[in-house]
Amino acid sequence: MNKEIVSKPVQDLGIAAYVLMHQYQLAGRKEKTFIFKVAKEKLKEFEDLKTAYLFSEFHDFDHCLMGLKKLEEYPFTIESNKFVTDLGAAAFLLMHKFKLLGKKGRSFYFDIHTPDEESQFDEMNLQYASSPFHDFDSKLMSLKKIL
């Protein structure tokens, strides 16, 4: 059986990464638009995914990423020894309600006071690497590199 395939454009990078996470095939890119191959019987599901992304945790994660990218170097001393250098991990920690103190160089410093908070911070930092948010971040980065 030969399925009819339709080309569907997606202009938002976050939506494109989210759609890619749901196994839709990327056909190419034209300027800032990503083109996906979608079986005709999957068109409604595809469109529903685009809407779902805007109200998902992945959109929140992307919002945290964008905020962190805009963050300028903090000009004062930061009294914290808990930091991460991975932008995605920092966004993941922000989503889990850890308070960001500032950025120094490539490091994002967090406000941690108790051994329990430190343990939770370390656990969340490790969880990020195997989370769907890491996969989403990886897809964002890959899509940016497609010319």
Tell me what each language-model feature is.
Residues A27-E31, H96-R106:
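Major-groove DNA-recognition helix of helix-turn-helix-type DNA-binding domains
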Residues I5-H22, N81-H96:
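Polyanion-binding surface elements
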Residues Q25, Y53, K97-K99, N125:
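Short, flexible coil/linker elements and helix-boundary hinge sites characteristic
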Residues M1-N2, F76:
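Glycine- and charge-rich intrinsically disordered segments
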Residues I35-E79, R106-L147:
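Long, continuous compositionally biased terminal/linker segments
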